Swiss-Prot record:
InterPro entries (UniProt xref): DapB_C, DapB_N, DapB_N_CS, DHDPR_bac, NAD(P)-bd_dom_sf
Family according to the record: Belongs to the DapB family.
Binding-site list for NAD(+): 10-15, 99-101, 125-128
GO-annotated molecular function: 4-hydroxy-tetrahydrodipicolinate reductase; NAD binding; NADP binding; oxidoreductase activity, acting on CH or CH2 groups, NAD or NADP as acceptor
Annotated protein name in UniProt: 4-hydroxy-tetrahydrodipicolinate reductase
GO annotation, cellular component aspect: cytosol
The reaction(s) this protein catalyses: (S)-2,3,4,5-tetrahydrodipicolinate + NAD(+) + H2O = (2S,4S)-4-hydroxy-2,3,4,5-tetrahydrodipicolinate + NADH + H(+); (S)-2,3,4,5-tetrahydrodipicolinate + NADP(+) + H2O = (2S,4S)-4-hydroxy-2,3,4,5-tetrahydrodipicolinate + NADPH + H(+)
E.C. code: 1.17.1.8
Residues the record marks as active site: 155, 159
UniProt function note: Catalyzes the conversion of 4-hydroxy-tetrahydrodipicolinate (HTPA) to tetrahydrodipicolinate.
Length: 266
């Protein structure tokens, strides 16, 4: 397979570290640079615990793109930084794979239009775990037969956004197969505000944040005399790397924006 030159934004994060290891063990991936505002001017190999890769680190993406030739930007930073990075990447005609969440519908619409105009491949993935993507697809299928559904997403206590991008994407897919319905008693009240979670077209999303968790989600469907639960668990960040690899390889052949890994797997 042809070599793919990759820039990683956020190499010191837990996802970023796994992505660096992915670069090292994948023959056709070449890590040509990284973005880390604290370690500009150093190399990946200078960072504690990192493999012996000589990829230079830049403090900002602007400077990096001026000096480095790359095929794909892999962004694993924060929602705020990720939005800035994908906007710049599209402007510069650089393909990107974005693993941060928190994009609004309006932001996604604008990015989709910009990517289409520039004909630049872009993938925004709320979740890179193949199992999580299948969970979302199975939930979408089940929604045709079960109108009553609630989502419980559980993540580590350092996650910044709630509900998770995976939960939001799951609800979006369920809504495509489900007639809008308010669940529970029509006169239901909350004795404590927020007790029933976020409400999207009658679908309640509950967010749990605890140390010891990584990324987990349950989609619970209820029917007469029965329940169906679709669950996925990621026990470490290595679970996301198969999706990262697939996304980097796939974005090379795209000329538009794709939101969600479910749109690039068969």
């Amino acid at each position: 397979m042809k070599e793919i030159k990759v820039i990683i934004a956020g190499p010191r994060g837990r996802m970023g570290y796994e992505a660096v290891l992915l670069m090292e063990r994948t023959a056709h991936f070449n890590l040509v640079a990284a973005i880390d505002y604290k370690h500009g001017g150093e190399k990946i190999s200078d960072l504690p615990g990192m493999p012996a890769l000589d990829a230079p680190i830049y403090a900002d993406l602007h400077t990096c793109l001026d000096e480095v030739e790359a095929d794909v930007l892999l962004d694993l930073t924060t929602p705020e930084i990720g939005k800035k990075h994908v906007t710049l990447a599209v402007e510069r005609g650089l393909r990107s794979v974005i693993g941060t969440t928190g994009f609004t519908e309006e932001e996604l619409k604008q990015l989709t239009e910009n990517a289409k105009e520039k004909e630049v491949g872009t993938i925004i993935a709320p979740n890179f775990a193949i199992g999580a993507v299948l969970m979302m697809k199975f939930s979408q299928m089940a929604a045709k037969y079960f109108q009553d559904v609630e989502v419980i997403e559980l993540h580590h206590d350092q996650k910044l956004d709630a509900p998770s991008g995976t939960a939001v994407k799951t609800v979006e897919l369920i809504r495509q197969n489900r007639v809008p319905k308010e669940q529970g008693h029509p006169n239901e009240t909350e004795q404590l505000e927020g007790a029933r979670g976020a409400n999207v077209d009658g679908i309640h999303i509950h967010s749990v944040r605890l140390p010891g968790l990584i990324a987990h989600q349950e989609v619970m469907f209820g029917g007469d005399g029965q329940m169906l639960t679709v669950r996925h668990d990621s026990f470490n960040r290595a679970s996301f790397m198969s999706g990262v690899k697939l996304s980097i390889e796939t974005v090379m052949n795209l000329d538009h924006l794709v939101y969600g890994l479910e749109n690039i797997i068969d």
